[in-house]
C-alpha cells in the first residue's frame, strides 16, 4: 500500500502497569497490513517498567508517540488525552492487554470508506497465555441505540470511529461503564454502527481486571441506564434483563 493515498488512522492505547502485555499489544498494531497509522500510548503514571518498555518501542518506530501523564487520571481520561491529540481521520482504541489480527485496520477502514462513521468487529476470548478459552463473539453487521440497549456489541478494542465524533464526545469518567455510555451517546448522533463479522480482536481475560468483576458491573449497569442515559424505570428494567441474559450467553455459554 502507498501510505500517501491512504488516510491516517490514530490508534489510542492507555497504559497503566502493563508490563506483562503492553509490548504484545503494540506489536499487534505494528504488524497491521495497513501501514498509515500513528500509535499514541498514554501512560497513566505506571508504577512498573511498562513506560520504559513503551519508550523503547517508540525508539524503533516513529509511528509511536508516548504521552506520559503527570498525575494518575484513570483509563477514561487517559483515552481522552490520546483522542484530543489524534491527528488521524479515524480513531481506533486498543487496551494494553488486548491484541488485533493483522488485517483489523484494513478491514475496518474499508467499511468506513463506504460511509460508516462507527465501525466495530467480532472478537474471541483468550487467557493470559493467549490460549482460546471461549467461542468467539460474532457481532451483527449493524446496530443502533435500541439494539444496544439489549446487547452491547461494541467494545473499546474493536472500535473504529470518525475522529471528529470522538473529539466531540469524550469519555465520561463519572460512570463505571464509560465506554458503553459513549457508544450510546454516539448512536444518538450517528444512528447506525456497522460491524465486521470476522474476528479481528483477541480479548484477553486477565485475572482481577475490572472487566472480570461482574457483580460490580451489574450494579453499575443499572446506574448507567438511569443516570447516564436517563431512561425511565420500565425501559431500564427491560434493558437490564436483556443485558444480564446476553452477558450469560457471551461469557459463560
Language-model region placement:
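Short loop->beta transition adjacent to catalytic acidic/histidine clusters or analogous donor-positioning motifs
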Residues: 6-9, 30-41, 49, 61-65
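Conserved donor NDP-sugar-binding/catalytic core segment of glycosyltransferases
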Residues: 103-133
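Short aromatic/hydrophobic "clamp" motif used to bind/position activated sugar donors
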Residues: 91
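N-proximal low-complexity "stem/linker" segments adjacent to membrane-targeting elements
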Residues: 1-30
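Conserved nucleotide-sugar donor-binding catalytic segment
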Residues: 84, 139-216, 224
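Acidic helix N-cap motif at the loop->helix transition within catalytic regions
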Residues: 20-23, 48-56, 99, 103
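A conserved acidic beta->alpha catalytic loop
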Residues: 28, 43-52, 71, 95
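Glycine-rich, basic loop-to-helix element that forms the pyrophosphate-binding segment
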Residues: 69-86
Amino acid at each position: 500500500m502507498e501510505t500517501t493515498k491512504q488516510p491516517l488512522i490514530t490508534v489510542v492505547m492507555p497504559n497503566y502497569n502493563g508490563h506483562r502485555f503492553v509490548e504484545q499489544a503494540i506489536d499487534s498494531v505494528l504488524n497491521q497490513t495497513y501501514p498509515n497509522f500513528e500509535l499514541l500510548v498514554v501512560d497513566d503514571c505506571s508504577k512498573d517498567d511498562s513506560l520504559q518498555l513503551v519508550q523503547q518501542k517508540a525508539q524503533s518506530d516513529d509511528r509511536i508517540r508516548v504521552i506520559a501523564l503527570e498525575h494518575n487520571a484513570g483509563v477514561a481520561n487517559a483515552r481522552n488525552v490520546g483522542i484530543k491529540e489524534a491527528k488521524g481521520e479515524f480513531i481506533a482504541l486498543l487496551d494494553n492487554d488486548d491484541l488485533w489480527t493483522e488485517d483489523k485496520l484494513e478491514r475496518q477502514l474499508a467499511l468506513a470508506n463506504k460511509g460508516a462513521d462507527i465501525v466495530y468487529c467480532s472478537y474471541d476470548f483468550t487467557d493470559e497465555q493467549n490460549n482460546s478459552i471461549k467461542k468467539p463473539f460474532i457481532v451483527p453487521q449493524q446496530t443502533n441505540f435500541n439494539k444496544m440497549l439489549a446487547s452491547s456489541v461494541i467494545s473499546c478494542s474493536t472500535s473504529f470511529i470518525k475522529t471528529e465524533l470522538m473529539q466531540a464526545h469524550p469519555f465520561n469518567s463519572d460512570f463505571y461503564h464509560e465506554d458503553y455510555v459513549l457508544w450510546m451517546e454516539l448512536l444518538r448522533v450517528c444512528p447506525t454502527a456497522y460491524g465486521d463479522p470476522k474476528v479481528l480482536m483477541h480479548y484477553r481475560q486477565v485475572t482481577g481486571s475490572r472487566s472480570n468483576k461482574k457483580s460490580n458491573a451489574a450494579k453499575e449497569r443499572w446506574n448507567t441506564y438511569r443516570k447516564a442515559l436517563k431512561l425511565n424505570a420500565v425501559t431500564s428494567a427491560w434493558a437490564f434483563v436483556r443485558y444480564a441474559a446476553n452477558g450469560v450467553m457471551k461469557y459463560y455459554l
